[in-house]
């Protein structure tokens, strides 16, 4: 089994291409994951799609063949040539894949380093795949460890202190352009997490908000939190509103644009629109009085954020490196523990068999049975103590697979008999004890 991650992000793929690769946690994601795990080289899969990245987190039998199949299917889905997809992709295998996953979950690979949205987005992607039956033991282990790593990074560094997000970066950009936003009015389209964060940042600066959403009841319930600073309108009024206000922020998660050029009326005042969605909500067009900012246009603020957090990022990378090593040590110990148990069970079974035989032949009085059992039990525990310790030590070394397979062969231990499924994510229940 191998871990494989294929990544398209703000680092290697422009926003127009990311739009074509984007998925939502719906029918398209389900259908794509079903095709992937049906392939004989792919065991499990998780699909992460956000405004800044599309990543395929896989457990595979053969990385090269699994990756090739993924590229074929992704080309069919996106209508992007397979060769271009291969050239753009960042591909990570095994240790590299786990390290990358931990970096992503800890927000070190984010456009805005230290933002906390990505961990929640990964949890949603994991839950979607798990509930759909597209991932099980192997990826569950990696994901649970990733979440623990991200928590450790947050707790042991200040990388998420006063975090900058795409939402806060867009509001900061608007403030840089327009100055004090107090008393101004901005339109916010959609009520997803990004829109909610944007509204919180705007109202904190004293800016009033007109929230445009299809579900007015849900929007009105959210608006109540802001004491009259947020009013709600339905989508039919969007065309009218965007022609009367200078600020607009959109993050709907729709698979198509919701604001088109033909909705725009000529006005004398300048307008600033922030498209925080991928795929983009706003149709790309040229205008002398409207400036449209997409996610990738916030790089200046992001770079400032990076420099401020550079020292904390170094500490975070150290934590991630340690967690990556711990993860593989833990995986290897999982494969050893059932073998040790099987060895002890064999010794116990042989001892009990001989005791029963001795009693039946009159060599041993029945009343001595329990005492002899205890003596023999202590004897084989003593005998197996050193091999057990040595096997656990070897399990942390590169050659562990060869040694473990040899032990299984010597003792006649069958893989099916180990019941490795029982060991699904033991780290969740034992790590706290180890950390204490």
From Swiss-Prot:
* Species this protein is from: Wolinella succinogenes (strain ATCC 29543 / DSM 1740 / CCUG 13145 / JCM 31913 / LMG 7466 / NCTC 11488 / FDC 602W) (Vibrio succinogenes)
A Pfam family this chain is assigned to? GlutR_N
Domain comment quoted from the record: Possesses an unusual extended V-shaped dimeric structure with each monomer consisting of three distinct domains arranged along a curved 'spinal' alpha-helix. The N-terminal catalytic domain specifically recognizes the glutamate moiety of the substrate. The second domain is the NADPH-binding domain, and the third C-terminal domain is responsible for dimerization.
- Top-rank lineage group of the source organism: Bacteria
Enzyme Commission number(s) of this protein: 1.2.1.70
**Keywords on record:** NADP, Oxidoreductase, Porphyrin biosynthesis
Q: Name one GO molecular function term.
A: glutamyl-tRNA reductase activity
What's the protein called, per UniProt?
Glutamyl-tRNA reductase
The UniProt similarity line reads: Belongs to the glutamyl-tRNA reductase family.
Q: In which pathway does it act?
A: Porphyrin-containing compound metabolism; protoporphyrin-IX biosynthesis; 5-aminolevulinate from L-glutamyl-tRNA(Glu): step 1/2
What catalytic reaction does the record list?
(S)-4-amino-5-oxopentanoate + tRNA(Glu) + NADP(+) = L-glutamyl-tRNA(Glu) + NADPH + H(+)
**Which residue numbers mark the site Important for activity?**
100
């Amino acid at each position: 089994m191998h871990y494989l991650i294929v990544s398209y992000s703000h680092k290697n793929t422009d926003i127009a291409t990311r739009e074509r690769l984007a998925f939502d946690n719906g029918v398209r994601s389900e259908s794509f994951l079903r095709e992937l795990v049906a392939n004989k080289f792919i065991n499990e899969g998780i699909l992460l799609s956000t405004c800044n990245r599309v990543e395929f987190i896989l457990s595979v039998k053969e990385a090269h063949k699994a990756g090739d199949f993924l590229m074929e299917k992704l080309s069919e889905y996106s209508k992007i040539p397979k060769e271009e997809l291969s050239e753009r992709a960042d591909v990570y295998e095994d240790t590299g894949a786990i390290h990358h996953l931990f970096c992503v979950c800890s927000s070190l690979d984010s456009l805005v380093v230290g933002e906390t949205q990505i961990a929640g987005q990964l949890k949603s992607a994991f839950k979607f795949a798990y509930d759909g039956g597209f991932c099980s033991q192997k990826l569950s282990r990696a994901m649970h460890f990733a979440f623990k790593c991200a928590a450790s990074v947050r707790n042991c560094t200040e990388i998420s202190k006063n975090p900058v997000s795409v939402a806060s970066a867009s509001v900061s950009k608007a403030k840089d352009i327009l100055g004090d936003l107090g008393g101004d009015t901005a339109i916010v389209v959609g009520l997803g997490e990004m829109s909610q964060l944007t509204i919180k940042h705007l109202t904190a600066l004293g800016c009033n908000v007109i929230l445009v959403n299809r579900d007015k009841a849900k929007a009105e319930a959210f608006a109540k939190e802001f004491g009259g600073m947020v009013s709600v309108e339905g989508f039919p009024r969007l065309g009218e509103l965007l022609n009367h206000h200078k600020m607009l922020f959109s993050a709907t998660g729709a698979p198509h644009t919701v604001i088109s050029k033909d909705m725009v009326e000529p006005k004398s005042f300048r307008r600033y629109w922030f498209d925080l969605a991928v795929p983009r909500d706003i149709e790309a067009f040229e205008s002398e009085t409207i400036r449209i900012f997409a996610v990738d246009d916030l790089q200046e603020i992001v770079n400032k954020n990076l420099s401020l957090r550079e020292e904390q990022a170094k500490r975070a990378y150290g934590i991630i490196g340690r967690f990556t090593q711990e993860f593989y040590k833990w995986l290897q110990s999982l494969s050893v523990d059932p073998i040790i148990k099987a060895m002890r069970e064999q010794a116990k079974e042989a001892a009990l068999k001989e005791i029963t035989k001795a009693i039946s032949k009159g060599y041993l009085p029945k009343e001595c049975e329990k005492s002899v059992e205890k003596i023999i039990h202590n004897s084989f525990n003593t005998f197996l103590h050193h091999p057990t310790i040595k096997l656990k030590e070897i399990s942390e070394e590169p050659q562990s697979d060869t040694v473990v397979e040899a032990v299984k062969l010597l003792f006649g231990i069958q893989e099916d008999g180990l019941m490795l499924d029982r060991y699904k994510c033991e780290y969740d229940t034992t790590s706290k004890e180890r950390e204490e």
